[in-house]
Amino acid sequence: MTQTVKNFGRGANECKRCGRKQGLVRKYGIYLCRHCFREIAHDMGFEKYS
């Protein structure tokens, strides 16, 4: 079988940092999974209010 590239759907995008496909934060063009986002959100300028 030949491997094909996924062009659309949930598995088409991946985290820029670790490559994970689940739990992706796409808002504002971030494209990080939720785990990586929590680790570097403060460095990116996001603040936790509650």
UniProtKB/Swiss-Prot annotation:
Cofactor note text: Binds 1 zinc ion per subunit.
Cofactor(s) annotated in UniProt: Zn(2+)
GO annotation, cellular component aspect: cytosolic small ribosomal subunit
Keyword RNA-binding: yes
SUPFAM superfamilies: Glucocorticoid receptor-like (DNA-binding domain) (SSF57716)
GO biological process: cytoplasmic translation
Keyword Cytoplasm carried by entry: no
Molecular-function GO term, any one: rRNA binding
Keywords, alphabetical: Metal-binding, Ribonucleoprotein, Ribosomal protein, RNA-binding, rRNA-binding, Zinc
Residues the record lists as binding Zn(2+): 15, 18, 33, 36
Subunit text: Part of the 30S ribosomal subunit.
Functional description taken from the UniProt entry: Binds 16S rRNA, required for the assembly of 30S particles.
The family this protein is said to belong to: Belongs to the universal ribosomal protein uS14 family. Zinc-binding uS14 subfamily.
Classification via HAMAP family: Ribosomal_uS14_2_A
Protein name per the record: Small ribosomal subunit protein uS14
Organism field: Methanococcoides burtonii (strain DSM 6242 / NBRC 107633 / OCM 468 / ACE-M)
Gene: rps14
